[in-house]
């Protein structure tokens, strides 16, 4: 009974049986030094993971002052079991500027918190969500959504999301959002399509969005896919277009990957080369470390795991800022300690 009480991954029926046995033999268990407090038992149901990252970023833009950043970031991921189907998940972040030895916000910040339920092939997430567009490998959006998301399907998988995005794009404005994506895998080929609708007053005041500056919507269509030549080499591509914008309305990415570093596999490594074009009126918040919205050009990178749970990354971008047609480049380096 004591060993069973220490386990935190039992079903509801098994847990009820253990609780009845613990109540019946409480005196014997206490005499053996087994602690039967419900508070202590429930505390074991909260699991913590996280990482500590050091990032170096050197950003260059033609006719602008160079920018060099050194950032130390701690992130914690608590996961609490609610019952057999539901969990509560969250992420906490604290940043420190290595040049000034000061935190950017001065405190630990809650990035998101949500409840996630799983019922076979159905997954439901409610709350504030770390949200990405998946079909395009997060070329259009990698940020947060306050609302709900549902995933379901087997051969063809679907994702539907509805909610509100704060700090939409690179501005401190909000947007209402609805989106759907469909994807499937056929042997070595994976592909999908998506539609994403954004509504915000931000678009009316956005310079270079439309000719008349009257539209407050973005309707983004996308397609993406990947092909695995073997266990080491894969080619990925994606394309997206905003049907409402008149300018800078297209985004595309082609990437060739070789292997990849795994934090659990010491000595593993990987590399990639890519060309990306990220029009600012469609790639609102892209996921990349060395390319941002309104940039285009080549990117290369490599990852390596020198020790278990310690990974390193180096990336370089050379290209242009699209709107002003000026040269741009960025160097990015990272060391991550996962726990």
Regions found by a protein language model. Name each.
Residues 8-9, 16, 20, 36, ...:
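Outer-membrane beta-barrel pore domains
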Residues 43-60, 64-197, 226-229, 251-285:
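Outer membrane beta-barrel
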């Amino acid at each position: 009974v004591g060993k069973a009480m220490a386990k935190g991954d039992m079903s509801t029926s098994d847990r009820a049986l253990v609780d009845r046995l613990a109540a019946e033999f409480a005196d014997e268990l206490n005499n053996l030094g087994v602690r039967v407090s419900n508070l202590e038992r429930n505390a074991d149901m909260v699991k913590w993971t996280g990482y500590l990252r050091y990032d170096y970023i050197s950003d260059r833009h033609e006719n602008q002052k160079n920018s060099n950043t050194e950032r130390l970031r701690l992130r914690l991921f608590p996961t609490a079991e609610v019952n057999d189907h539901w969990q509560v998940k969250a992420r906490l972040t604290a940043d420190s500027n290595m040049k000034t030895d000061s935190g950017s916000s001065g405190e630990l910040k809650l990035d998101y918190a949500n409840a996630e339920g799983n019922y076979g092939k159905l997954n439901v997430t409610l709350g504030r969500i770390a949200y990405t567009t998946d079909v395009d490998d997060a070329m259009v959006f990698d940020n947060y959504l306050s609302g709900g998301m549902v995933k379901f399907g087997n051969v063809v998988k679907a994702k539907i999301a509805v909610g509100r995005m704060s700090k939409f794009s690179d501005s401190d404005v909000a947007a209402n959002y609805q989106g759907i994506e469909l994807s499937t895998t056929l042997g070595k080929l994976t592909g999908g399509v998506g539609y994403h609708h954004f509504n915000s007053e931000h678009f009316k005041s956005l310079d270079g969005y439309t000719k008349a500056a009257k539209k407050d919507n973005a309707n983004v269509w996308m397609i993406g896919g990947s092909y695995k030549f073997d266990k080491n080499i894969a080619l990925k591509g994606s394309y997206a277009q905003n049907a409402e914008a008149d300018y800078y309305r297209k985004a595309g990415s082609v990437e060739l990957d070789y292997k990849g570093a795994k934090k659990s596999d010491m000595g593993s490594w990987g590399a990639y080369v890519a060309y990306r074009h990220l029009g600012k009126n469609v790639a609102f918040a892209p996921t990349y470390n060395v390319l941002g919205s309104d940039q285009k050009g080549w990117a290369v990178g490599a990852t390596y795991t020198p020790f278990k749970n310690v990974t390193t990354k180096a990336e370089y971008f050379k290209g242009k800022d699209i709107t002003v047609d000026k040269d741009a480049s960025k160097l990015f380096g990272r060391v991550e300690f996962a726990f």
